[in-house]
Design a protein with these regions (language model features):
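Short, glycine-/Ser/Thr-/acidic-enriched flexible segments
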Residues: 1-4, 112-115, 123-125, 139-141, ...
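Class II aminoacyl-tRNA synthetase-like tRNA-binding/catalytic domains
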Residues: 1-8, 18, 71-78, 202, ...
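Short, amphipathic alpha-helical segments
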Residues: 3, 7, 11, 42-45
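Hydrophobic (often cysteine-bearing) scaffold residues that line and stabilize catalytic clefts
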Residues: 9-13, 86, 90, 150, ...
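Composition- and surface-driven signal marking solvent-exposed, interaction-prone regions
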Residues: 10-13, 120-121, 213-215
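Metal-assisted phosphate- and nucleotidyl-transfer catalytic regions
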Residues: 16-139, 160-187
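Hydrophobic, well-ordered secondary-structure elements that form the walls
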Residues: 108, 144, 196
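Active-site pocket scaffolds in enzymes
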Residues: 151-205, 209-221
Length: 221
């Protein structure tokens, strides 16, 4: 969305989910813990570092060093890759200790910059990017961010990502020259959103992923 950001993406995402829920007559859906999810109620916004801190019982900040984070992971039996830095460790701690427990709609925000290379840097806090993931019923439904539109900074980030690809990181991104060339011609400020339609259908119908995944025969096993 041109001239949007992560906050306009929140509004758009909530509207999309609610419109779909109202269309099928299910604005209240059953939750995995036996409770109910009222999609028309308030949606929470929570910084990822705060959620990880709550799970660990100790404060974790953007400046917490790698050895300290690895000690936390060891204490909670969270396995880590040797190549991971602080940002990747924070995300793994979140995914292993927190994500499944987020039943009510929650925008998990303020990710460490290294794990969201296509997002703008945070407008207030150094070391973070303006990005979020929407979690409902313990499942990631949609990621979004304030799009990075500076081609110089984007090239630096993608070059760093390509080095991670060379080291075998399966989640890193390749350098995309066509994308960078297009950005050099000019890109307005924008918000970006990716909605998991199959997961939205799962939420609203109670069906499993086998019944909702789009074009399953084209997906790898």
């Amino acid at each position: 969305e041109a001239y949007g950001d992560q906050f306009t993406m929140m509004e758009l995402t909530r509207a999309l989910v609610l419109d779909a829920a109202r269309a099928v007559g299910r604005t209240v859906v059953p939750a995995r813990d036996g409770s109910e999810i009222d999609l028309e109620a308030q949606w929470r916004q929570a910084p990822i570092l705060g959620l990880v801190s709550e799970a660990l019982g100790e404060e974790v900040t953007v400046d917490t060093d790698e050895p300290t984070l690895r000690k936390h992971a060891d204490r909670h039996a969270v396995e880590l890759q040797a190549s991971w830095g602080p940002a990747e460790i924070v995300v793994e701690l979140y995914e292993q200790l927190v994500e499944d427990s987020l039943v009510q709609p929650t925008f998990v925000m303020d990710y460490p910059a290294a794990v969201k290379p296509l997002a703008k840097k945070h407008r207030r806090t150094a070391g973070l990017n303006e990005a979020w993931d929407l979690i409902i019923n313990g499942v990631e439904l949609a990621p979004a961010y304030s799009e990075l539109n500076d081609p110089v900074v984007q090239r630096e980030r993608l070059e760093a990502q390509s080095r991670l690809v060379a080291q075998g990181d399966p989640e890193a991104m390749d350098l995309d020259e066509a994308f960078l060339t297009a950005m050099e011609f000019g890109m307005p400020p924008a918000g970006g959103l990716g909605m998991g339609v199959d997961r939205l259908v799962m939420l609203l119908t109670g069906a499993g992923i086998r019944e909702t995944i789009l074009f399953p025969l084209l997906r790898p096993e």
